[in-house]
């Protein structure tokens, strides 16, 4: 199946969803050589991954993951692709805690650092939040505390077959897209930041076909896989079974533009300190970007009707002490 897929890819032909699914199944099962795996990943990257191919690969990867079921709960994820080179602090992790304090159920899927100094797993460990949760513990944490971390490497064990090849290739592959598309929990919504504007609409199509009810796939004009405060953010939103593309700016929400340097982070320890400062009410650009992204989670999490209301609520959550209180509850 994989060899047939490679032959099509080198002719720059698009794989069907089932062909991509079959090829990825073989990879996940560890049935292929590293040479064939590298050829498949390189060929896809050169050709450009299409919606059907991403969908098929995501389906295979999810089927190989350890499952987490949150019955009768509408939970969302805020996992992004990473790889944006922005060197920001862990914005989505911070915004997730704020949103959870506002009543959103967060199934935060993530991993240790890839291209940055601090992945979500790294900063949460530094914050004292448990990352090594079993499926039943994830379910209980989401139900009782409103947020739990799903450590990707513990739930996607088949990825061990891929790790050496990805490291050897040294460039972005389809797996950079698959991470945020393969949350082991049966989420209903997602805020998904991507490293390239060209990916927002295609990945929204994938999420829609995966059955998500609400989602925002977004990319900042500066390349951030977050809603940025340096300028415009491109958004592809899933709502009522359709995808709408639009642009938002910080001033639309009464937030002043800042420089990318103003939201830079560092080591997991430094980023943990930044997050605690924000949750305790410290102002400035770092709070602003956390508030904007928390607003997206509050909106997709069905707590607010729009982003403007989300911004107001996120500010109130922080200023009332509820955000820091939620953090204390999580540790």
From Swiss-Prot:
Which positions does UniProt annotate for Mg(2+) 1 binding?
92, 226
Which residues are recorded as binding Mg(2+) 2? 225-226
Q: How is the cofactor bound?
A: Binds 2 magnesium ions per monomer.
Can you name one GO molecular function term for this protein?
magnesium ion binding
The entry marks the following residues as binding 5-phospho-alpha-D-ribose 1-diphosphate, namely 80, 83-84, 88, 90-93, 108-116, 120
Pathway given in the UniProt record: Amino-acid biosynthesis; L-tryptophan biosynthesis; L-tryptophan from chorismate: step 2/5
The record's function comment reads: Catalyzes the transfer of the phosphoribosyl group of 5-phosphorylribose-1-pyrophosphate (PRPP) to anthranilate to yield N-(5'-phosphoribosyl)-anthranilate (PRA).
Q: What is this protein called?
A: Anthranilate phosphoribosyltransferase
Q: Which organism is it from?
A: Clostridium acetobutylicum (strain ATCC 824 / DSM 792 / JCM 1419 / IAM 19013 / LMG 5710 / NBRC 13948 / NRRL B-527 / VKM B-1787 / 2291 / W)
């Amino acid at each position: 199946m994989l060899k047939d897929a490679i032959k099509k890819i080198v002719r720059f032909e698009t794989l069907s969803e089932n062909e991509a699914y079959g090829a990825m199944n073989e990879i996940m099962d560890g049935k292929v050589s590293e040479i064939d795996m590298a050829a498949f990943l390189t060929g896809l990257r050169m050709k450009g991954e299409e919606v059907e191919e991403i969908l098929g690969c995501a389906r295979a990867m999810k089927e190989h993951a350890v499952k987490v079921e949150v019955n009768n709960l509408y939970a969302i994820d805020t996992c992004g692709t990473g790889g944006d080179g922005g060197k920001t602090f862990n914005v989505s992790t911070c915004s997730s805690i704020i949103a959870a304090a506002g009543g959103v159920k967060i199934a935060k899927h993530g991993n240790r650092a890839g291209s940055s100094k601090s992945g979500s797993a790294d900063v949460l460990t530094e914050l004292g939040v448990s990352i090594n949760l079993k499926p039943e513990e994830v379910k209980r944490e989401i139900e009782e505390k409103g947020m739990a971390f799903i450590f990707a490497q513990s739930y996607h064990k088949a990825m061990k077959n891929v790790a050496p090849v990805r490291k050897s290739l040294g460039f972005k592959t389809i797996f950079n897209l698959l991470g945020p598309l393969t949350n082991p929990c049966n989420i209903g919504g997602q805020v998904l930041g991507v490293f390239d504007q060209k990916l927002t609409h295609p990945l929204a199509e994938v999420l829609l076909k995966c059955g998500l009810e609400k989602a925002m796939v977004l990319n900042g004009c500066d390349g951030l896989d977050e809603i940025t405060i340096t300028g415009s953010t491109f958004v592809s939103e899933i709502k009522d079974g359709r995808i709408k593309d639009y642009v938002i700016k910080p001033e639309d929400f009464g937030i002043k533009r800042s420089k990318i340097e103003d939201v830079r982070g560092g080591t997991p320890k430094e980023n943990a300190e930044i997050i605690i400062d924000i949750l305790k009410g410290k102002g400035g650009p770092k709070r602003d970007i956390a508030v904007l992204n928390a607003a997206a989670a509050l909106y997709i999490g069905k707590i607010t009707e729009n982003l403007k209301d989300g911004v107001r609520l996120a500010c109130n959550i922080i200023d009332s002490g509820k955000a820091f209180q939620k953090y204390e509850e999580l540790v």
